[in-house]
């Protein structure tokens, strides 16, 4: 499994399209040739939750620059996001990539990849899963499940603190492990298209760093080792050697 720094200490993407763990035994009704569902963890704080805006207009009714709709409607940039729209111009979803996310204080929700996998209730936001899901879906021969374990304003120093860092294990670390285990156990029932599939934990995406950066005395000096410990402990607790 390759861990590739893509945005300094604040963002590390770890993707491996190969299986990280021995495949779980297939269910009795699963044909032997049915491709396994590749599972990716998307973890972090508010930016991983999803703060991208689909569309917004100013008081004069003009489209606000920088939104997804603005990019899609500008001839200079439309081609960059053309794959996100269907032939009718509506925002499209995929039938081979799915998301699972439990926003703060709410139960987990599963859905085909598309707009709205965020804590916002307005259906007008999206997160990194939207672009990443299309890349993975195009690259992988078989279904993909993106499990989001992201909660805004949380630090690695305290909230996501892994057991190997000593002190009290962070509640977000424990919740992340629990959410991933629940997804692996339940997604086959929650998502009809995945029924009968094997699930292979295949990658980890970490988009994080702001809160720790606000604590240069304590959190910043520990961030590198805490991140190493996070990876090591996740491998152990999720059975990924």
Tell me what each language-model feature is.
Residues 21-23:
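Bacterial lipoprotein signal-peptidase II cleavage site
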Residues 25-241:
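Cell-envelope and extracellular/periplasmic
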